[in-house]
Amino acid sequence: MARRISGGKGGHASEGFRPSREELLAFVRDNPDQAGKRELARAFNLKGADRIWLKDMLRALQDEGLLEKRAKRLVRSGSLPHVVVLDVFSRDPEGLLLARPSEWPDENGAAPLVSIRPARGDRARVPGIGERVLAKVFPTGEAEGPAYTARVMKVFEKRREAVLGIFRVLQDGSFRIEPVERRQAELIVEPDHANGAKAGDLVEVDQISSGRFGLPRAKVLTVLGSLASEKAISMIAIHAHDIPHIFPPEVIAEAEAARPATMAGREDFRDLALITIDPADAKDHDDAVHAAPDTDEANPGGHIVTVAIADVAAYVTEGSALDREALRRGNSVYFPDRVVPMLPERISNDLCSLREGEDRPALAVRMTFAADGRKLRHSFHRVMMRSAAKLAYGQAQAAIDGRPDDKTGPLLDAVLKPLWGAYAALKRGRTAREPLELDLPERKIVLKPDGTVDRVFVPERLDAHKLIEEFMIQANVAAAETLEAKRLPLIYRVHDAPSLAKQESLREFLATLSLPLARGGQLKPSSFNGILSRVKGSDVEILVNEVVLRSQSQAIYAPENIGHFGLNLRRYAHFTSPIRRYADLVVHRALIGALSLGKDGISRDQEARLDEIAALISAAERRAMAAERETVDRLIASHLASRLEEDFSARVSGVTKAGLFVKLPQFGADGFIPVSTLGDDYYIYDESAHALFGERTGKGYQLADEVEVRLVEIAPMAGAMRFAMLSEPKPLPGSKQSFHKSRRGRARAQRPSPRGRSRRR
């Protein structure tokens, strides 16, 4: 029998009754910030054996897909987080604004409808249709109408409904716009609306008319650059994703007016041989490292590691024009042909860059490690430092490998060898910690001077890279530990364990390879590492690495700590890159305030806004990732535009009921093969095996298969390519025909048609 619940959140029903499934789901829906196991037990007054029953019931609801775990809280599956970015798109009959989340996973179905509450107060900024807002959302619990109401926290800049496209001149001299988004129709531009655009220019246009017949007309608003003569391809993604790339005059003025920091309130670390190790083409250097053996007899074989990070907080004060613009950008965005920095060059490449031989302010952490890599203690210091050397990764590695040059030779014994000695200890600690160790190399694009692709290669992963990475991880952990110890709020970098649904999907796939996967609370990064080690060197190594990667959650910023699953750390924050990440700047300010290192620490106001800031910078990070990925796709598609009808070796990189995505390993680019072009069989989508297999033959294609393909269609500005399959399907003994999946509409592809249509990923 279900317990009756009182009107309050606490629940004071009599003993001996347990809540029904519906009551549990209702509580989770109505209390999105309080629905942990402990809160549920308290709300329904469950004790002893009833708490064990509750745990089992919640697990069952998760297994059924009705609940999911998010930041140690239970939420209804497919629900919105409490703070979310929304796009306002319409009004209801009563005049209230309607919105949808700006990002929504396809697997969650249709995006929920959100009704925006009227703003309170005369000064409240009222959003309009077409604008983007940051809002707190509250479930309505209604079966019909909007699923949520929202209170607007911030209104972003109004997005212009402009079209991005290529300016074309036809043979008769008339002008056309070829939209970057292929679903949009071509546009006609009259000569007096061309705004000086030339053939091949990337332009932003405003549609000015659209009749019942003929193409719509437009006027050119902005000429963004020539695709023939300038590095303009990245500008497509910059504008498509509304990435701020031009600093306002007041921001530039503030940066230019900044003066070098003084020694006031700082320790003098200028005699410590800190060095920077970065990519050879790096322009800004925000971290420097030093290591020395620990002379304390109580720590035999130990090491003292110092990591110094550019003191950006000394120049970017909270609430300033620089600070507001940095938060708006969230992070620097890295394209193959350019960087869109978070901070102006005067700050990022000059005053804050830890240049060799020049005095620079820094926030340093000094850490003592035991011989087995355990961190024994650490301390933070606000310092003035002077980099002893600027080295590239390959240069430092060559010196350690016995090939020092004129610069690294004098540093080898006193500076480099102690660094590698400390890294050997930290590596032992990392091995004991057992973080997730995926082996999926990243590719780097090298461009010619004209901005076109020269080559694509996989950079070698050196110990020098791993050394810096591990030193930075330890510094980030120290920052989180210090702020937690001071009981101060902070923005964590959190990474949740895979959801139960993704775990089960992965478990089904691994079962086809006779590989077991631990369940629930026993699932740790080492569980995945054991599987990856078992398939290392086998035919399915790449396949298993890809599927394990897809099962993982996405790391985000959050004011609540749930730990970092991938790194296998209980607490983690970003501290080491304040030049290019706003999260790190917030952590710097928090440390300065917590440790009384200056008057420019975090304010009460910013502490109160950590929820909002975390949501903003998480969204900015996803925006940057999407823009970077799309730019690479466009560059590669442009590079291959002259190679239609050529054959390529490829690997299946994705499987859907609509067809196969294939990656060209030598270029790192993806294209699509529609299921309707695979042959005369009827292909069925096996989700658990990540495969399409023929109903008649039982043969098909699976994720990570090596195949031969032919390039048959290409749209360079959309970054889209369509291929034809040349390889014959192979037997797939692990695949299974699943009638119940097909009835849910997830498994079966469409019946083959005479002609397939390309689809953009």
Predicted regions and their residues:
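Acidic, low-complexity intrinsically disordered tails
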Residues: 1-19, 682-691, 725-761
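Charge-lined substrate channels and their catalytic hotspots, especially those that engage the 3′ end
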Residues: 2-306, 313-358, 390, 395-400, ...
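A generic structural motif
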Residues: 92, 141, 156, 171, ...
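A short macromolecule-binding patch
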Residues: 107-117, 184-189, 668-685, 733-734
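Electropositive polyanion-binding surfaces
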Residues: 210, 236, 240-243, 250-679, ...
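Eukaryote-biased detector of low-complexity, proline/serine/threonine-rich segments
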Residues: 362, 705-708
